[in-house]
Amino acid sequence: MGDGAEIVTRLYGDEKKLAEDGRISELVGSDEVKDNEEEVFEEAIGSQEGLKPESLKTDVLQEDFPLASNDEVCDLEETSRNERGVENLKVNYSEIGESHGEVNEQCITTKEADSDLVTLKMNDYDHGEVADADISYGKMASSLDVVENSEKATSNLATEDVNLENGNTHSSSENGVVSPDENKELVAEVISVSACSVETGSNGIDDEKWEEEIDVSAGMVTEQRNGKTGAEFNSVKIVSGDKSLNDSIEVAAGTLSPLEKSSSEEKGETESQNSNGGHDIQSNKEIVKQQDSSVNIGPEIKESQHMERESEVLSSVSPTESRSDTAALPPARPAGLGRAAPLLEPAPRVTQQPRVNGNVSHNQPQQAEDSTTAETDEHDETREKLQFIRVKFLRLSHRLGQTPHNVVVAQVLYRLGLAEQLRGRNGSRVGAFSFDRASAMAEQLEAAAQDPLDFSCTIMVLGKSGVGKSATINSIFDELKISTDAFQVGTKKVQDIEGFVQGIKVRVIDTPGLLPSWSDQHKNEKILKSVRAFIKKSPPDIVLYLDRLDMQSRDSGDMPLLRTITDVFGPSIWFNAIVGLTHAASAPPDGPNGTASSYDMFVTQRSHVIQQAIRQAAGDMRLMNPVSLVENHSACRTNRAGQRVLPNGQVWKPHLLLLSFASKILAEANALLKLQDNIPGGQFATRSKAPPLPLLLSSLLQSRPQAKLPEQQYDDEDDEDDLDESSDSEEESEYDELPPFKRLTKAEMTKLSKSQKKEYLDEMEYREKLFMKRQMKEERKRRKLLKKFAAEIKDMPNGYSENVEEERSEPASVPVPMPDLSLPASFDSDNPTHRYRYLDTSNQWLVRPVLETHGWDHDIGYEGVNAERLFVVKDKIPVSFSGQVTKDKKDAHVQLELASSVKHGEGRSTSLGFDMQNAGKELAYTIRSETRFNKFRKNKAAAGLSVTLLGDSVSAGLKVEDKLIANKRFRMVMSGGAMTSRGDVAYGGTLEAQFRDKDYPLGRFLSTLGLSVMDWHGDLAIGGNIQSQVPIGRSSNLIARANLNNRGAGQVSIRVNSSEQLQLAVVALVPLFKKLLTYYSPEQMQYGH
């Protein structure tokens, strides 16, 4: 044969069945080894598809052999990394003359009963042992040793000698584990072979250098050949029967997979030799020539250079040799998939690296490989720890007498598997064997009773006084830990109780009872702060909040207590909280109409009330705290084992402990998988509902009158009377020049004709209007004179000024009745306005009832009470107070308003106000301030701001306003502002134009045009409305309203009211007849038939 090296992959059809000499040792692997094989297969099968070298036209097939002494057949597993390591090996060389190389590579397969398995884990890749063969004159001998070491796994480093007789070339290749410091080429290949052929005869080609570096954990073997046809190299011989190799090739135990640390028992060595005279060697004629004599990596290496590779070379008898003449079995399939089942979960393809002249470019930094290696190690370690958590939880449930089919147990195991999938690399699926193996291991450990259970749980008990906290603790430990008394407080200080329940260490923190009343929250804060100081060094794992099942309440009576707990400990206290309902053996109350209610329905309703209250207190409506029932009474029904049983057949103590242990197990899994940031409340715990910024902004943009002194209450706000004083003087003189007028009686009016009656009524209306204008004008003049006189008497003696103030501000000494309230229309025969009459007394407080206009009770329709008063501070600063409280059977609403104004300078005044009102189930507190500038007669400007506290969110707003007064009939108000909260901003503006009657307010004509714009979250809302009131005669009005927005929604309404034209009521018959006609339409008749 000529010089050079050639890799040949033996085809299944060309292999000859050779007689097998030697003996085959049997090794039965442990359960852990089996599981690891399945795991490696699942992770490796994805990369088998589409990764075949271009130069190799055939595939390596694998055979199944019958077991020698065991009927159980283990599925053959072979990873794609092995195939790359065996099939894709190429040696590039410069072909000179007739130089040929022959290397026989074997595809090594295994059977569980026929082989020894040692899987090494180095650089996050599982490299198996490679059996090295010495090929000489067609004979091959392979040997394989099984290494057993609990601390270090040794790598079988074999040397492969290829004797080429015809040429003078001697090449060797060594199998080993490549260290992370090697180049990408060494990592990509399992077996690295490089050869350089030198022809010293006729071709006259210069000598070339050949290097091979293999790092085997402890040392590196370097061989250099400079112009030599033969070389000296280091090789490690594997001695049959040895249990350890040279120290220079030992692999640290830390790189060994945890499942493989259970060493298999060595029973012998496997030797297979070829007895036939030679092997059929088929040379590969598609070898690519490379001038630089470098290693050429196949396309599959190029495509999967960055993929995670886990190769496992399985030791077995050679597929070309057999002790018997039995026919070869077809390729084995994975367990559970069947013969025709396709391979699942292909590995994701990565972007191909750029190539230069057909070779892979190795310019990627080595840090990427190191990071991938670290992630794989961390992933495998995390899976083992998570499996240990599964085993621990199954042991806990087993001790509590719960099967894996229990709802709580199944749910916890499902969450653990789901978390592992989310955390696992590339979203790898968790095999079903994880649960089976964990369950079997848990049962085995519990049956052996030798391995102690490393688990303890700390439970802190909170609850109202008298719900049974101390009694529950005694029931958990089945002994009297704390003395209880039905008439005295059991626990007066925080104390720690420890004990064992079914061999599990349980620590319970007992706390003093809390009080639900709002007035007792200060005392509760002291108790809870002492509890917080007690648990600072050793925080509890679970919080058990106890309440009574038989104390049902649908109101928010416990909300002050729950909010106090949240304020002291923070909202996170409820994330690992369990709700316990004591007195669970109580009979459910009667249902509606005296019928018996279901026990399960009663428990569900009571649980929902407490869970909803906890959600509101924590500020997270996604919380769903588990509920457990508790019964501590000695007369409670028990089962044969002496455990207390509830009316629904549940044994409450194991269920409560299982919930507590499950919560801690899930917390441990969260900490292991680093999912702490994903728990509820970590990001949204303190975030409550966002404030309604558009509503707050619209309230801010509303124009409010400023508080005034008592003598200024009836003054016109804008002093528009000064705008047209000439017209007022003319109307006043006109009234004085009117001739005398005699009023007619009803009898005299009946004698008048229709035209005469109309003229008489018109004259009467004209005279009344002029008289009312004169009265209003005189009242304004009197107010101005009093204001001027008050300014002049400031320098006078105190006694005189006090008399003037009393005359000015003292109310009437005789109470006078206030006008009757206008009650809504009803079908009652009586109009009980007399029930709502009250007197205007000399008291400064004005207290009035609040009438529910839409209520069903017209006799006594009181809904609340309203109180108002005007204070004067230092005779200059008015302070107005108004409050209203309304109460019905379910809710109570409070509305409070406090306002004041101060004048500073000419034409400038500042108002300050405080509002408190209900907003849903919370109270909204608003502080607002506004400054007005009245320097111009027809133009007035204002600027204001407000701050609103709603729940735990604070909103701040700013507005500007401008009022333009053209004359007495036309005015326009423009305002704009913005409201912000939590980084969210809403913008808005309003425009209102008003056109009044010439004789307003005596004239009834009024038209108003409004336009509003609101921008919130990029959503622009534009709305317009118009309202007009037109008088029709003396006693009729026409009111029309219309509104439209930018979304096409609008409304139009027309209303006519009259006190004389009763025939207008006939219009109400139109919709009635229209409805009746629809009942007798042909469509309805046909449908009826």
UniProtKB/Swiss-Prot annotation:
Supply the InterPro entries for this chain.
Answer: G_AIG1, GIMA/IAN/Toc, P-loop_NTPase, TOC159_MAD, Toc86_159
**Residues that hold Mg(2+) according to the record:** S470
| Chain intervals with Acidic residues compositional bias | 713-737
Q: Which residues carry this modification: N-acetylglycine?
A: G2
Known cofactor(s): Mg(2+)
Q: Chief location of this protein?
A: plastid
- Residue ranges for the region (G4) are 582-585
Q: Where is the composition biased (Low complexity)?
A: 327-339
**Is-annotated flag, keyword Heme?**
no
Enumerate composition-biased segments (Basic and acidic residues).
300-312
Record's note on what induces expression: By light conditions.
Name the segments for region: G3.
Answer: 510-513
Q: Where is this region: G5?
A: 631-633
Q: What Gene3D superfamilies does the annotation carry?
A: P-loop containing nucleotide triphosphate hydrolases
Annotated region G1: the residues are 463-470
Tell me which residues bind GTP: 466-471, 485-490, 583, 631-632
Pinpoint the AIG1-type G domain residues.
Answer: 454-683
Q: In which tissues is it expressed?
A: Expressed in seedlings, flowers, and roots.
Q: Which residues cross the membrane?
A: 1064-1080
Q: Where does it localize? A: Plastid, Chloroplast outer membrane; Cytoplasm
Query: What does this chain do?
Result: GTPase involved in protein precursor import into chloroplasts. Seems to recognize chloroplast-destined precursor proteins and regulate their presentation to the translocation channel through GTP hydrolysis. Probably specialized in the import of nuclear encoded non-photosynthetic preproteins from the cytoplasm to the chloroplast.
Q: Which family does it belong to?
A: Belongs to the TRAFAC class TrmE-Era-EngA-EngB-Septin-like GTPase superfamily. AIG1/Toc34/Toc159-like paraseptin GTPase family. TOC159 subfamily.
What is the official name of this protein in its record?
Translocase of chloroplast 120, chloroplastic
